[in-house]
């Protein structure tokens, strides 16, 4: 268990990272509209690692100007957090963010018994947004753990259309030049896939290799 001073430092670091991400140019995806921020159910975005789950949730919250607190449990400094520590996490979040009605829990499935905390938050009328990327967030488990108090939103890597939007490739033009650019983009898409981070890094082979290994290990 971390003492509250260390916990505050970690969560403050994460808040700082969140501020940096607010300045990024992002692609608004159709799944964003599926996140019902007015619902009393937990909104659970599920997908493979690096498919853009966190970004999708950030965009939904920022778009409507909701005041929220954020925790990324996929942080090595929080590796030993237990379910009984989550109230301390909540206390520190109130200290950092002030009052809030939306709680964004990134990869909370890493914590055994996480659903007990989430259920308590829902009973307190807290709006909860969750992301997850492994077998611990299977539909059957969610139905059991959250007793119907959740809405699942599946998310996949970019479609070719979304890939084109991010790469500023014309998806409608029919001139020889436009079609040639579109075919070239499709060739790249087939080779590297639609993981969002691949659009901003130069070398993709090691990224994909490491990502596949990471997904299989999880």
Locations of the language-model features?
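Structural recognition of the conserved hydrophobic beta-strand(s) that form the central parallel beta-sheet
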Residues: 127-133, 154, 163
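Short glycine-rich substrate-engagement loop in P-loop NTPases that contacts/grips substrate
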Residues: 69-102
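Short regulatory helix/loop adjacent to the ATP-binding pocket of P-loop NTPases
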Residues: 136-152, 166-168
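Walker A (P-loop) phosphate-binding loop of P-loop NTPases
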Residues: 49-50
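Hydrophobic anchor at the beta1->P-loop junction of P-loop NTPases
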Residues: 45
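A short, basic N-terminal segment
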Residues: 1-39
